[in-house]
Structures are given as C-alpha cells and as structure tokens.
Amino acid sequence: MSIAQNNIGYRNKMIIGFKKYNGKILAGFYEENSHKIIDLDYCPLHTKEQNKIAQAIKNIIIKLRLPIYDEDRKTGLIRFALIRESFSTKEILVTIITASENFPARSEFVKLLRESSDKIKTIVQNINSRSTSIVLGEKERVLYGPGFINDELLDLKFQITSKSFYQVNPSQTVILYQTVEKLAKLNKNDVLLDAYSGVGTIGLYLSKKVKQVISVENNRQAVNAAIANAKVNQISNDTFILDDATNFIKNVDKKSLKIDVLVMDPPRTGSTIEFLKATITLSPRQIIYVSCGPDTLVRDLKYLLRGGYKIDYVHCVDMFCWTNHIETVVLLSK
C-alpha cells in the first residue's frame, strides 16, 4: 500500500453547499448520510487558497443578497460552489451552481470574486434545475476566462473543466499511474483500451508504451478536453470516442479490433454486467481495474474471475486521506 506522505491540504477540488437556516447563510459540507449543511470556516484537507475563495464566495452571496436555493420549496438561486486548483500552475477554476440560468448579479459577482484572489483564471456558471442532490447540471456558461484551467502531471499538460473527472490528490495520482504502468508490462505492439477515460490522463500517460490507445468516455466536455490534451502534448496514437463504455465494448468487433490490455477506471458505482461480459468475450491479455469503491470492485472482480481471469496483484493507494475510502489497482490476466 502506498501511504500518503502529505495528508493536509492535499485536495485539488472543493465543493461547497449552501443553505439558509434561521436567517443565516450556511456554507460547508453535507453531514454524512444527510442533507444537513455543516457550516465551516476552514477545512484542513483543502488548501489555504481554496478555503479563502470559499469564504469569499459566501461573503459575496451575503453582500449581494443572492437567494439560496431551498430544496424543499424549490425556490432560490445559489446551490453549490465548485473550486478546482492546479497544484502545478496554481490556476484556479470557480464554478457557481445555480438553480436557473437567470443570474441578475453575475457581473458584480464575477468582479468581487476576481478581487478575492489573483489565482482565479476562470469563472463558470453551471445551471442545475433538477430536484436532485447531484451537484452539476448539464448546461454551463463561462462568465470569465477560458472555461478551464491548465495542470501538469507526470510531464504531461492537461486542461481541466468543471465537469472533468480528475483525481483529487495530485501527489498520490502520480503513484497511482506509475503503479498502473508498472503492472501493465506494455509493449510497442499493444492496443490499449482506456475505459471511463475522463480527460484522458491514464491513456495519454501510457500512450508512449503502446502502438495505439482507444479512450472511451461518455462526457462530451471531458472528451473535448482529452482531445485538446493530446494535441498540446503532441500525442497522436490516442483515439478519443464519445460513448458509454458499456455500449462501446458491447459493439467492438473482435475480429477487426484486438484489445491487448484493458484499463478501466469506473465511477464508485463500478462497471456493469454487460461491460464485464463483453470484456470476457473480447479476452484482453490483461485487465487493470482502478477502483475507488471496494464494494463494487469485489462485485465486479467476482464476475471476471468466473469468466476465466485470475488476480495477479492488488495494490492500494491512500488517495483520500482521513476518509474510509481508498483507491485500489488490481491486475488480472488469463
């Protein structure tokens, strides 16, 4: 297991929820297994700059008298704030999540927010009108800057947007990806499928070791960022496909496309039976399963074992310090 050497201020992403209670605006995190907001002035898992900006957003909301969204009455405007920080370039993206597109004070909001930190490179409004606890909606509007920030990881450059899947612990991510590379034992003739690829981090990192990478991701914004990332890093052997991973792998013609190595990094909910069944049919030489959900990892591994694969190696990375979550890398082969 790779223990984190730095367990304070390690997160590059902060999500703040807002609630009005007894006339006071609360800004903080949800209490576990509830919709109760715990009002926080400072969280040690995040950087000083992220904490400073979070407090600035709260103060701006109070100053401009912006109405906080009430999930019971379905009224109000401000729902969440998302702060993403590059530890390499120090650039910061702030996304304000609103219940409707109408944001009357947005110009003043942007002005005051920019004055709070010179690290803020871009500000985005995300519109989420759904009655759900899911943070981000589908529609976005860039209020300031390019709509993304730049980050550097393992000698590669990446564009990060509000919707991009990107690991939250940069120093441990380096260890995670190096572990994947070490376990894969790739060669220059291999075709690698990077499923649930996000902004392309794993596939782009491994591209120098293989003949071809096929990266599949169902988020259009992430795919666009991945294409830009490949271009800026001058990588030409990684193909990016906008599709659901299950739908893609079910329709792969085994005769026309031979997948040698599968790298899969699904969400905490794990993969699908249809994806795993199609994987067994495709029969890649190796599967590297990267998981942040131990329960769903065990469930999916059982299916792959019944399909003829065996577990060669398991390695855990302490990605989420001070929580009961852990990142796991599993190498399987036939």
Where do the protein language model's features map onto the residues?
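Short, solvent-exposed loop/turn elements at beta->coil junctions and helix N-caps
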Residues: 1-7, 80, 84, 316-319
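A short catalytic or substrate-binding loop motif that flags glycine-/basic-rich loops and adjacent residues
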Residues: 6-11, 20-22, 73-75, 143, ...
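Nucleotide donor/acceptor-binding cores
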Residues: 12, 90-92, 189-190
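Short, low-complexity Ser/Thr-rich regulatory SLiMs
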Residues: 18-20, 85-87, 318, 334
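Short, aliphatic-rich beta-strand segments
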Residues: 19, 83, 90-99, 157-161
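Short, acidic/hydrophobic/Gly-rich beta-strand patch recurrent on exposed beta strands
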Residues: 28-31, 95-97, 226
